[in-house]
């Protein structure tokens, strides 16, 4: 092997190593920033157990909102057709947050409850994002849930 071929070989090896390193770093960065959406039924079934941070989506159970008198801490239940998950959030809630409202909370499970660091409320109680509608429809036996589904008030 002459000097030119050796030089090209080392150049190709260096470029391939740099590309592999770049792909690995990008994959790790994307994996840390991904936030999967789960419903309360999926959380109860243990589907979210492997994730430190995830999104919880569903409806705010009527009458479950409790505000602390001495802080901005709010607790409430997020429900779907089959389950409910207790959520704790410290901060200012969106103006559209209320009972029977579609909500997505970003956070983590801690001591049997979901501790949210962000809460997003939807514009209308009949609106449901496609991702949440699809996730809730998976656990629903029977007709699929339409995008303009009525709020769930009978789940405890």
Curated annotation (Swiss-Prot):
Heme binds at residues 123, 127. InterPro entries: CcmE (IPR004329), CcmE-like_sf (IPR036127), NA-bd_OB-fold (IPR012340). Coiled coil: none annotated. The keyword Membrane applies. Residues 30-156 are periplasmic. It is a single-pass type II membrane protein. It is found in: Cell inner membrane. Keywords: Cell inner membrane, Cell membrane, Cytochrome c-type biogenesis, Heme, Iron, Membrane, Metal-binding, Signal-anchor, Transmembrane, Transmembrane helix. One of its GO terms (cellular component) is plasma membrane. One of its GO terms (molecular function) is heme binding. GO terms for biological process: cytochrome complex assembly. The chain crosses the membrane at residues 9-29. The keyword Acyltransferase does not apply. Its main location: membrane. Residues 1-8 are cytoplasmic. Heme chaperone required for the biogenesis of c-type cytochromes. Transiently binds heme delivered by CcmC and transfers the heme to apo-cytochromes in a process facilitated by CcmF and CcmH. Belongs to the CcmE/CycJ family. This is Cytochrome c-type biogenesis protein CcmE 1. The gene is ccmE1.
């Amino acid at each position: 092997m002459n000097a030119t071929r050796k030089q090209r070989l080392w150049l190709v090896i260096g470029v391939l190593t740099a590309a592999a390193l770049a792909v690995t770093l990008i994959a790790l960065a994307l994996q840390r920033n991904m936030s999967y959406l789960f419903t309360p039924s999926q959380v109860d079934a243990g589907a979210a157990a492997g994730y430190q941070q995830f999104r919880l989506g569903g409806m705010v159970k009527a009458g479950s909102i409790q505000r602390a008198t001495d802080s901005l801490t709010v607790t409430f239940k997020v429900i779907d057709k089959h389950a409910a998950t207790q959520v704790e959030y410290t901060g200012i809630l969106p103006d559209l947050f209320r009972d029977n409202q579609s909500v997505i909370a970003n956070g983590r499970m801690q001591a049997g409850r979901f501790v949210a660091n962000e809460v997003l409320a939807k514009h209308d109680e009949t609106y449901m994002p496609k991702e949440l509608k699809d996730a809730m429809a998976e656990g629903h036996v029977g007709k699929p849930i339409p995008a303009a589904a009525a709020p769930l008030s009978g789940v405890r």
